[in-house]
Amino acid sequence: MLLADLVDEDPDPDIAATLDVIVAANADILLILGIDYDAEGHALAALTNALAAREISYPHLFSRRPNTGRPTGVDVDGNGRLGEPRDAQGYGRFNGQGGMALLSRLPIETDQIRDFTDFLWADLPESAAPRVLSPDAAQVLRLATVAAWDIPLRRTTGATFHILAFHASPPVFDGPEDRNGWRNADELRFWQLYLDGWSPNGPAFTAENFALMGTLNVDPDRGEGHREVVQTLLDHPALQDPAPRAPDGRLVTTDWDEPTPGNLRVDYILPAATLNVTDSGILWPDSETATPPRSAVAAASDHRLIWVDLEF
């Protein structure tokens, strides 16, 4: 999602469709993936202004420079050329391409945010990095493909609710070493360890009210990737899986080409096991008479918006 698209008086249909999807969801907390980052926050401001024009308000925003497109200075993919998109910390043609942003109606405790975006992959316990990277790449490559955040929000009661947000690497587009597959697996394992009390810096995570959310990029039942790792995360005793479904009952969250890669479940919201989930779903209309219509949702993204209602 580009700034130029958002400020254009005649925006592309996919931008208008994205706004339609966000308005239809009307979430209190919204994690957007794939939004380009700029240091002054112009793109995010343009997005919130466009939503405000549709009477949807998000007064509290958070975004930081992602790893996508950030130079490493080494030949990560080993093809003998430097400075290409696959040599960046996360795949990207420019730094900030396809970043993340959190939009919230609850105040963000900005000074308490824990940002793990710069954590080195090789520093993860039992990291796969030394097996799949060159020594030079292992010294500099970060674990997060895009970003990894622990963001506390302040509820009206004064209590905090944490959003654990990330966007993992697709476990494809590599070679026989399975570099991206193992990176994806370790990005998921990071959060398993974090929930178990391990921390890359600072105190252990002890919050009771939280949700882990983002694009994990692995389906536990089919497709590429180390499916056993995502299944272990889904089974973690600190989490629950509401298993949001589309109106037709499917769990898949993408509309991809069949048979490969096929429609897969790669997007998740996993609340704390102690929270009361009252409803969940996937915004995937089955007709043109729905609001928004099926074609608009398809134009917005090949991923579908998933949602979970919590009562606590």
Q: In which residue ranges do the predicted regions lie?
A:
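Active-site-proximal beta-strand elements of phosphoester/diester hydrolases
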Residues: 1-5, 114-117, 160-170
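Active-site-proximal segments of metal-dependent phosphoesterases and phosphodiesterases across multiple
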Residues: 168-188
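Beta-strand-turn-beta hairpins that frame and shape the catalytic cleft
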Residues: 105-110, 139-169, 312
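N-terminal, active-site-proximal structural segment of metallo-dependent hydrolase catalytic domains
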Residues: 1-100, 130, 137-140, 156-161, ...
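Extended hydrophobic secondary-structure segments that form protein cores and membrane-embedded regions
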Residues: 61-65, 164, 209-215
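Solvent-exposed loop/turn segments at secondary-structure junctions
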Residues: 1, 35-39, 66-71, 108-109, ...
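Active-site catalytic loop in hydrolytic enzyme cores
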Residues: 116-156
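Metal-dependent phosphoester-hydrolase catalytic domains
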Residues: 107-115, 119, 123, 152-153, ...
